[in-house]
A protein has these predicted regions:
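Cysteine-centric segments in proteins
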Residues: 21-143
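Bacterial Sec-dependent N-terminal signal peptides
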Residues: 1-22
Length: 143
């Protein structure tokens, strides 16, 4: 009887540990190397790595209107715009949500490339449950 009880307790503990690991999965953004079809026209393309930027590999892609994409742990996630704010100093804050994630992109125009395009820098914050990841990003936005 004691053996059965010990096995039962060990099994319960193991199941709790496995479930806990699933809920505490680390947020790991992956590079998106192909722009999704519904992102066309004006875009915001951001990464945290200059080499990746040259290779056209981004961690967030937006249509500068209603849709953005991120790739987390190998899964492409479509996000919908919740809120867009103009902040002082050519700074913009866009909040997106989808598939349990909240994503906050804050970008500031660093250099105007031409009439319709600018070089931007800022931060990207990805939140899911109690997990948060905040990274510096840079990229290009415009039409």
């Amino acid at each position: 009887m004691k053996t059965v009880l010990m096995l039962l307790l060990c099994s319960c503990y193991f199941i709790k540990q496995v479930n806990g690991q699933e809920n505490n999965e680390v947020i790991k953004p992956d590079f998106i190397t192909q722009i999704p079809r519904d992102i066309e026209g004006c875009t915001g393309l951001y990464t945290f790595d200059s080499t990746a930027f040259k290779k056209k590999a981004y961690i967030i892609e937006t249509d500068l209107r209603q849709t953005a994409y991120i790739k987390i742990n190998g899964k492409l996630i479509k996000l919908k715009l919740l809120n867009n704010k103009n902040l002082p100093g050519e700074t913009y804050k866009s909040t997106y949500s989808g598939d349990g994630y909240t994503v906050i992109l804050i970008s500031k125009t660093v250099k105007q490339i031409d009439v319709e395009k600018s070089l931007d820098s800022g931060t990207l914050e990805i939140i899911k449950d109690k997990q948060k990841l905040k990274v510096k990003v840079h990229g290009i936005s415009g039409c």
